[in-house]
């Protein structure tokens, strides 16, 4: 070294920022099982954050029957000099279809046609399909032209809710 030249040392430390993963989305059925919100995040999220959203989150779990749909935010605190970060899971809650409850009817072979949906209990969703021993047209059964037997009313579910059925 040159005489009279001073030296200084600078230490550079690089800190990796916290990783909350990437945003996610999930659809659940309102009568479905609880699920982990953390598992819905993409990437490799770092554990140890906190959840916030339209409903209180306990243990990182979303329970469809008791929690509201909406955006749930996973937040990790700052790791100086890196700022706090967060990712969001958008939760959609779908209602299961309601085909009503099964019913029964006894008809005279010379009787008038009847509306099958009126034979179901409860409040069946409209728009379902009928199947049975004879083709059902307009939801009506005509004892003079159709076969006796079990007729099934099927209402399609919105994923992940499965289709539901009731019978007459």
Show where each model-derived region lies.
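Proline- and Ser/Thr-rich low-complexity, intrinsically disordered segments
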Residues: 1-168
């Amino acid at each position: 070294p040159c005489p009279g030249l001073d030296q200084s040392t600078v230490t550079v430390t690089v800190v990796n920022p916290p990783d909350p993963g990437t945003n996610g989305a999930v659809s659940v059925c309102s009568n479905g099982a609880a699920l982990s919100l953390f598992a819905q995040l993409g990437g490799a999220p770092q554990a140890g954050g906190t959840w916030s959203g339209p409903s209180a989150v306990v243990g990182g779990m979303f329970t469809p029957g008791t929690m509201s749909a909406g955006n749930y935010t996973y937040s990790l605190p700052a790791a100086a000099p890196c700022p706090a970060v967060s990712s969001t899971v958008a939760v959609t809650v779908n209602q299961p279809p309601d085909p009503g409850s099964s019913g029964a009817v006894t008809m005279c072979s010379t009787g008038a046609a009847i509306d099958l949906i009126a034979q179901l209990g409860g409040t069946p969703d409209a728009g379902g399909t009928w199947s049975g021993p004879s083709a059902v047209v307009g939801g009506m059964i005509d004892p003079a032209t159709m076969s006796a037997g079990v007729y099934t009313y099927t209402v399609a579910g919105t994923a992940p809710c499965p289709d539901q059925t009731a019978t007459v």
